[in-house]
Amino acid sequence: MGIISSNKKINVDTMKCDGTARVSLAITAAPDILENPADIVLVLDRSGSMSGTPLASMKEGAKTFIDIIDEATDGNKDGQIGSGSRIGIVSFSDTATVNAPLITSVADLKSAVDSLVAGGSTNHADAFFQASQLFTIPSSSQKVIVMFTDGKTTSGSPPLPVAEAAKSSGIVIYCIGLIGSDGIDVSVLNAWASDPDATHVAVTPDAADLEELFAELAANISKTGATNIRIDEVL
């Protein structure tokens, strides 16, 4: 996910005040998901405010995400997440539930998503905690949490310390926010997510956009590259 090494060379040893020089910059991008498997936990909000269209749109988005990872890990949609990657499902309202552990079966993952029913309050802290617990078995794979929510925390402990602990343990956190009836604080999502915000947080007021946001995020996770490149030279 991003740049893992860079090297810069200049083609002269000395230079006059008005002279010019050629600077060569070599960048190595992080390998994609085929070479660098990932364990990904989709954390899905099923609180009462998600009832109706938001829940249906979230389900379609989550299933599209699963399909893209399926294809990216072995070159085709064969119903199995390949190359050592896995996906898990955690959903939350008053408390969080592990609907699917880290597995490779696309059918089982989609069944877990389809089983979700909206109702209750919004407990983000328990959602982050339960998702983090799925990574307790040692693994060399990347650890990724994708948090989807449509509103503010209304029950449970403050979620930020739990999210910070997850990041400190090596988990990368992405956030997708739907601006629901209770509103959403984007600064909170930015605080939960890994840096930089521009590539780890996406927010929309329209449930119809969710499938596209999930798809873009899946592509970002599975087909990495060098992004946000900045070159500063002072000669």
Where are these regions (language model features)?
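Short, charged loop segments at secondary-structure junctions
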Residues: 44-51, 63, 67-70, 80-133, ...
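VWA/integrin I-like adhesion module and closely mimicked acidic/polar interface patches used
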Residues: 54-57, 76, 115-133, 140-144, ...
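C-terminal "exit" segments of structured domains
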Residues: 2, 18, 33, 200-235
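Hydrophobic residues positioned within well-ordered beta-strands of beta-sheet architectures
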Residues: 6, 21-25, 88, 174, ...
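Surface-exposed acidic, glycine-flexible loop patches that form ligand/cofactor-binding
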Residues: 15, 31-34, 67-82, 132-141, ...
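Exposed beta-strand and adjacent loop surfaces of beta-rich binding modules
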Residues: 37, 84-86, 97, 142, ...
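Acidic, polar low-complexity linker/tail segments
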Residues: 1-41, 46-56
